[in-house]
Amino acid sequence: MSLYPESTVNTFTANQQSSPDTALLADGSYVTVWQSYDQDANNTYGVYYQRFSASGVPLGGEFRANTATDGGQTNPHVAATSDGGFVILWDDDSGVDGSSQGVIGQRFNVNGIAQGANFLVNTTTASTQFQNAVAGYTGGFATVWASYINSDYDIYLQRWDNTGAKVGGETLISKTTGAATEQAGNQQSSDIAASANGDLVIV
């Protein structure tokens, strides 16, 4: 195992860059995402990413993932996809989902080129959807988030194929086994891991 010196990931260094996440890609390279304050000159956070070779050499420059720049784009997460690319998710309060906050995503190919447009992850848009997480597996990826419904927060899941098409609908996860309705109280801050065959662990 080779160890390389630490280095600064972000090129833009003014203000604050925080909340990083990283995914190892199929070709051995990796991609890192973070939120950066006022880099888009809008007095809010935006989501940026940088690709690196396996030895940590930057591949191209850093780029903004979010199209909407009103409000804040925060809490980014990234996962590798089985086609060699990656997908980035973030929480967005620009109003693009028609309410206070939603979860937005963007797919990229192995070269870091955006595939299609930013897309809305959550189908239910009333009130707040946030605290996203994402995991990739063979043929697709899965997203989870917290959604404020019926006066408390619950965890929802949505599967996607690698083209960005939904596989089924969003599914309530935080419920007692065999029950049709959500658990009482708040369930938040979920995380997700996937095996290659698409089996999921959600906490």
Regions found by a protein language model. Name each.
Residues 1-203:
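Extracellular, repeat-based ectodomains that mediate carbohydrate processing or recognition
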